[in-house]
Amino acid sequence: MSDSAVQRSSGRGRFITFEGGEGTGKSTQIKKLADRLKAARMRTLVTREPGGSPGAEIMRHLVLSGMGKLLGPEAETLLFAAARDDHVHTVIEPALKQGIWVLCDRFADSTRAYQGSLGSVSPGLINAMQRVTIGDLKPDLTIILDLPVEIGLQRAAARRGSGTPDRFEGEQLSFHQGLREAYRKIAADEPARCVLIDANSDPDTVAGRVWSALRDRLLPTPASVVSV
């Protein structure tokens, strides 16, 4: 399908989330996809978690600085939930109702992977918080970028330069290996929503894979449109 076919989409916006471990290239791929959608004259909003709204950005600082970790895994998860609640109700939902396509760097799957699988927070608590913070909101498509842990951490270090690793970049190698497996399990458990994409290639090649996933899942080719 050509990019012009994207313009036929109307009504409520689409919600696309990007997930993956550290250094997998989420921000790069979100920008490339946003540029392509905007070139097709689609209204597009790029946002992130934790953060994305003034209130949520305060929580982002608390979490990534490591202050949340001092409170214990459950309390840290509550900080993420508070940030998500503000983000969903002040940014994401209003944009979707206006027909805007929302591209989000991390969402609820990050809580399942980081705090659920690796942070010893019970699935029951996570599910309860999700019912309160996001209700019935669910991504139309989740792109999970997959990359060998060592390569991802090297990329993250190069991006950071001389800066201090954040709360999660500074975790042990075993943490990041477990994180990769947690994301792979999410992709395997929810194939209708999630697409696992090999991110161990140059950015343009990965961007092509992301576009193919979006086109196939959200932009089915009408009989009257000739694929190119």
UniProtKB/Swiss-Prot annotation:
Which keywords belong to this entry?
ATP-binding, Kinase, Nucleotide biosynthesis, Nucleotide-binding, Transferase
Coiled-coil region(s): none
- CDD domains, per database record: TMPK (cd01672)
Instruction: Quote the biased-composition stretches of kind Polar residues, using this chain's numbering.
Output: 1-10
Top EC group: transferase
What are the boundaries of the region Disordered?
A: 1-23
Q: Which GO terms describe its cellular component?
A: cytoplasm; cytosol
Protein name as catalogued: Thymidylate kinase
